[in-house]
């Protein structure tokens, strides 16, 4: 039976590796009674290379660290002004398939941006969300023990230049775009609030409980 309560953790600005290891720990130690959680965070500049990642897609990392991680997909960039959301969900319990979860995540971004009259869309052959063929949100998940971790990154109000140091998600020349330039949410906080609403509605959560920071382990 699905847990109809979603716990939202507002982590503020946190370095990538500590949050990644906390996600792994939560997933590895959770059981059938554990809460579904949505972690909302902003990371300092970092490139993360997914399991399918090829080194040739990192063109010139320069002074930005590159971290090899255990999610799907290729290389992407995280930095200040980008909303990062990690859904830690028991999809086996809720009987949601992996492809269905990806579709729900993409659609929650599309629905949120539609509130700002932004015509965004997903693409069947390239995970993420796009506006006029420019990418506004990236997606990369990992499923372990029937539970999801990792998640999505939405460009809100950030320096997009570091994306030119890589082939984003393995696509050479892929142009990125962000919410602020399109009249969407102007801050990471606003984007997080709005995305939480559309995400919880799409996945059928009826109660939201908000927390500041990570739970004590």
Swiss-Prot record:
Domain of life of the organism encoding this protein: Bacteria
GO cellular component, one term: cytoplasm
Residues binding substrate, per UniProt: 71-78, 138-140, 151-153
Entry EC no(s): 2.3.1.181
InterPro entries membership: aa-tRNA-synth_II/BPL/LPL, BPL_LPL_catalytic, Octanoyltransferase, Octanoyltransferase_CS
Stored SUPFAM superfamilies: Class II aaRS and biotin synthetases (SSF55681)
Name of the protein in its database record: Octanoyltransferase
Source species of the chain: Shewanella baltica (strain OS155 / ATCC BAA-1091)
């Amino acid at each position: 039976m699905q847990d109809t309560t979603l716990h939202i953790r507002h982590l503020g600005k946190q370095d990538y590796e500590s949050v990644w290891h906390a996600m792994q720990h939560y997933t590895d130690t959770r059981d059938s009674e554990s809460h579904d959680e949505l972690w909302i965070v902003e990371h300092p500049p970092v490139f993360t290379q997914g399991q399918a990642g090829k080194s040739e897609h990192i063109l010139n990392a320069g002074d930005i660290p590159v971290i090899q991680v255990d999610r799907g997909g290729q290389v992407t960039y995280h930095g200040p002004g980008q909303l990062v959301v990690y859904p830690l969900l028991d999809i086996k319990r809720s009987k949601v398939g992996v492809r269905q979860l990806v579709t729900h995540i993409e659609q929650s971004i599309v629905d949120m941006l539609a509130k700002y009259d932004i015509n965004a869309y997903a693409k069947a052959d390239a995970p993420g969300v796009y506006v006029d063929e420019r990418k506004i949100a990236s997606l990369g998940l990992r499923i372990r023990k029937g539970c999801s971790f990792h998640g999505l990154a939405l460009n809100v109000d950030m320096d997009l230049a570091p994306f030119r140091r890589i082939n984003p998600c393995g696509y050479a020349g892929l142009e990125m775009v962000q919410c602020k330039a399109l009249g969407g949410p102007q801050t990471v906080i606003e984007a997080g609030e709005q995305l939480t609403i559309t995400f919880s509605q799409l996945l059928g959560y009826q109660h939201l409980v908000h927390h500041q920071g990570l739970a004590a382990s």
